[in-house]
Amino acid sequence: GEVPTVPTESPERLLLRNFHIAMGSLLFLCSFFRAGLWLIHPPQNNNSKLPDASYAQVHVLQFSLYCAFIAQGISGILNAWWDGLIQFVPGVDTINHGLWVTVGYLHSAFGFFYINLILFILLFRIYHMIRYRAFSLNVFA
């Protein structure tokens, strides 16, 4: 079969790109806020059944997830800048295909990285629920 694609210069592609940029920007800003809040007010282990080491393990993974979102946001901004989608200095040509491709691959790699982090967080949470009977609905604290 054929892989479904959206033509490069179509209005649908522009809509999808703008949606991607808007959602990515929102995730970047929320993650930046959440990581800052995390540093100011670190989470406390309120569950008496869960050992401190297990609690710290999951929260290090969760903090790493926010850092991955922030890194992906930075690589997304650089990717859009070197593709000419955004300009920080009017009239300056910032299009650089080599940097655009390199940062684009990095942007994609961060996506795969945070998918794996989410999987590990969920698996460790399930493991802790089974082993320690420490149930928590707050999966991404």
Name these PLM-found stretches.
Residues G1-A141:
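Membrane-embedded alpha-helical bundles that constitute the cytochrome b-like, heme-associated redox core
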